[in-house]
Amino acid sequence: MARPSRILTLIVSALIFNALHAQDTLFARQTICTLASPAMYGRGMQHRGDSIAADFLRKELAAYGLKPLAKNYFQYFRFPRTTTRPPIVQAGYRSQNVCAYLPGKSDSMIVFTAHYEHLGMHGDTIFYGAHDNASGTAAVLDLARALSTQKRHYTYVFLFFGGEEAGLVGSSFFSDIPLIKLDKVKLLVNLDLFCGGDEGLMVVNAHDERTSPYVDLLESINDEHRFAAKIARRKNAPNSDHYPFTSLCPAVFIYTLGGRYGGYHSPLDRCEDCGLEHYSNFNTLLHTFLNRLEK
């Protein structure tokens, strides 16, 4: 029979674990609801919603003590062409990537990315973009927040891209004019579409010889702990901000499979419809993965 002290320790540990998970999910929910609120105007060009969102991210990163990769954390770029459907953007419109880092003992880097902008507005209709991609942005911001309190071997870089919906504009600009040495990147992980997840996680560009060992590690961790229903793999595709980097460094894109989220690329992609039932498990999976890489 287990001793009472042992039972008490297990109970306390379980309570602490559950409390930490609840805090992670609460942070993600609050961040998603902030980014997908009417005050952000769909994070597009209209009313400069993208700049309002970028300023929110800049303030959060500064509060966590992350260092800027560019002045005021912003790398500015301009859109090359006018679009006629959401996201409605005028050629020459200036937007920004939000770029920060946590220095480690090594100059070898692990990079997390997410696109923070969305489709903006069409007439008076707001495209809120909770799933796409306030959710991935919140997950990357949560990682930055947690890692800022820890001493790490690797340098961690956090990039929040603009212009993804108009054709990977911000990430392509960064890959062309990088603020870091891309040959020092050990792995780049892009998070996009991170609500739901009843059916697990998909890893894009998982079959590349440079990325497959990392996906193997992620899968083995999940086999041990069952953080996700499954880890699925697919070949590379130009469907998110990892793509401009795939010829320059090991880069993958992770998104959720199944579960609850609002309408894709519609005004119904709202905060209240973003299911976060699996968020804490996915967050713990990523932290466990990083801890294994650090060994």
Protein language model regions, located:
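Solvent-exposed loop/turn segments at secondary-structure junctions
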Residues: 39-42, 61, 67-68, 105-106, ...
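A non-catalytic alpha/beta surface segment that caps or lines the substrate-entry region
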Residues: 43-101
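Extracytoplasmic/secreted proteins, especially bacterial periplasmic and envelope-associated proteins
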Residues: 27-34, 48-63, 72, 135-142, ...
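Acidic/histidine-rich catalytic neighborhood of metal-dependent amide-processing enzymes
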Residues: 94-96, 120-213, 217, 238
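Structural recognition of the beta-strand scaffold that forms the well-ordered cores
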Residues: 33-36, 98-99, 109-113, 157-160, ...
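Bacterial Sec-dependent N-terminal signal peptides
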Residues: 1-25
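Second-shell loop/turn segments in exported
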Residues: 38-48, 86-89, 124-133, 160-161, ...
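Active-site-adjacent substrate-binding region
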Residues: 199-295
